[in-house]
Amino acid sequence: MRLITAQEIIQIHDDILERLAGVKGMPDPGRAEAIISRVHHHILYEGITDLFEVAAMLMIAIAKGHIFNDGNKRTALMATLYFLFRNDVKLKKSNQLEDWTVEAAI
């Protein structure tokens, strides 16, 4: 399993805000690393091997973790899709992705 790093999440967020409106910045620069470390900890110590379970954990952690001043849900979606892509998972286009992302943040 090829995991995603905090730096990759920050880069994804920055790329999103280059293209779309949003307030740049991070209230706590260490939060990205803390959130990703927590996800990696769960994977390691709970023996999680299911890619979709890890993807769900990533999406929820990023969307609810409020790493950034703006764009957390967009970043959560794109980071999760990137994680799945780098692990050779192909997804069909679906309008449900937006709904799932909003639900993950609730």
Predicted regions span which residues?
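FIC/Doc superfamily catalytic core
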Residues: 1-106
